[in-house]
Amino acid sequence: MLLSFLPLLPLATAALTYRGADISSLLIEEDAGIAYKNLNGQTQALESILADNGVNSIRQRLWVNPSDGSYDLDYNLKLAKRAKAAGMSVYLDLHYSDTWADPSHQTTPAGWSTDDIGTLAWQVYNYTKEVCDTFAANDIALEMVSIGNEIRNGLLWPLGATDSYPNIARLLHSGAWGVKDSALATTPQILLHLDNGWDWAAQKYFYDTVLAAGSELTSADFDLIGVSYYPFYNADATLSALKTSLGNLASAYGKKVLVVETNWPVACPNPEYQFPADLADIPFSVDGQSTFLRRLGEVVAGTDGGAGVYYWEPAWTKNAGLGSSCQDNLLVDYNTDQVRASISALGGI
């Protein structure tokens, strides 16, 4: 057979390794009486709806000692068991706080040291190991663990603020080894997560500084780089800029890269910031969500080392704007609790 005479067939686009959703609020939503419906209008557990539509990984946030128990360890064990039962992997996002951790808030948990870095580093190590050991004791495998959430401005303030990158490095090293030394049969991949994934200069500054010669944090301490990518906070947050940043991150630091938080609105009548120019043709609609997710998936899949995309809180019907100036960023209709057709786009990227 002369293979040269065979017609050239188009290559199928490979799906991303991780097509995920952060559904941390699920148990709270259900306690409030929300019952989700699938695309056929039938009531079904949210994790099963997601799995049926191609989503294969669940991200969930863990707070140390929240005042009302929301997102604590017991909460996360319950949620993770459901994700695993639905056939999905679990990505645990350690906030190292009793509440939200992000670029504007990195409050050290109550009872943890705020004046001695050695003590705090041990607390980070012991807490992280205890969390992972508890998952192991419950026979729940973890696919990946993020040591900190959106830590561009550091973590565990004040000791882990950006006026002391050696402290940041020490805390991250301690967290990483809490995972590595745990009783989990298979060590989860360890992820570092910054916001503004489109901003290569900010990403480069953080990683170059925290990994500087002599740093306690080394490249061997972590496996993955994750970024948040929200198009409604900055006109400079173009897909083109994200593509450049992801490619540079993967090549400069030798890590797989993921977009671990993202959204697109179905309604945004009065955006606080201008949307990026290369997304201006995408409507604020269910079809627009699908288009955005496909384009984003193409950018990540087209990056050497691009591994996945996670949609942040697609079903939080009590918080449809998800902290943005847009009215509704959900993949679920908050009037009917039925998933939108764009859920299939997330599972298909």
From Swiss-Prot:
GO terms for molecular function: arabinogalactan endo-1,4-beta-galactosidase activity; glucosidase activity. It holds the Pfam family Glyco_hydro_53. InterPro entries: Glyco_hydro_53, Glycoside_hydrolase_SF. GO terms for cellular component: extracellular region. Its EC number is 3.2.1.89. Residues 1-15 form the signal peptide. The keyword Cell wall biogenesis/degradation applies. The active site is at E150, E261. Gene3D superfamilies: Glycosidases. One of its GO terms (biological process) is pectin catabolic process. Keywords: Carbohydrate metabolism, Cell wall biogenesis/degradation, Glycoprotein, Glycosidase, Hydrolase, Polysaccharide degradation, Secreted, Signal. The keyword Hydrolase applies. Transmembrane segments: none annotated. Glycans are attached at N126. Endogalactanase involved in the degradation of plant cell wall polysaccharides, and more particularly of hairy regions of pectin. Belongs to the glycosyl hydrolase 53 family. This is Probable arabinogalactan endo-beta-1,4-galactanase A. The lineage of its organism: Eukaryota, Fungi, Dikarya, Ascomycota, Pezizomycotina. The gene is galA.
